[in-house]
Amino acid sequence: MKPAIMKPVRAKKPRTRPVDREGREQAALMEEIALRYPDVFEMIYHVPNGGHRHKKVAEKLKHQGVKAGIPDLVLPMARGGYFGMYIEFKATVDPAPVSPSQQACIRRLNDQGYLAIVCRGHFDAMEQLRAYLLLPKTEVAA
């Protein structure tokens, strides 16, 4: 019988927790909107499509209508001839690329009369929102 060969045990490096920069920046944006534009804060909402989910949960949500590519933030306030504003939010540091499904969705929304844009970070999104809010209200013909 051969003697057992003992291999040295290597200590595993502790894994660093992933940092959700996009989520943090978007939360900061929502805080600023709440402070500066309370009426807008009441209307704007986040579409929780992203994130990693268990396969069964993702399948269930897909059957309930979750679609890939829908922008992160929706503001259903009509301005400047647009019916509303959609923002695909990306972090300023290590931003994820705009996916083909996001590009296609943004194009479809723009074709339907919405202002759908990609914003890189909290400050970019705030500037775009300010510019949108300065546009005259879209009047609906009765």
Name each model feature, range by range:
Residues M1-A142:
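Catalytic phosphate/metal-binding cores of nucleic-acid and nucleotide-processing enzymes, i.e., regions
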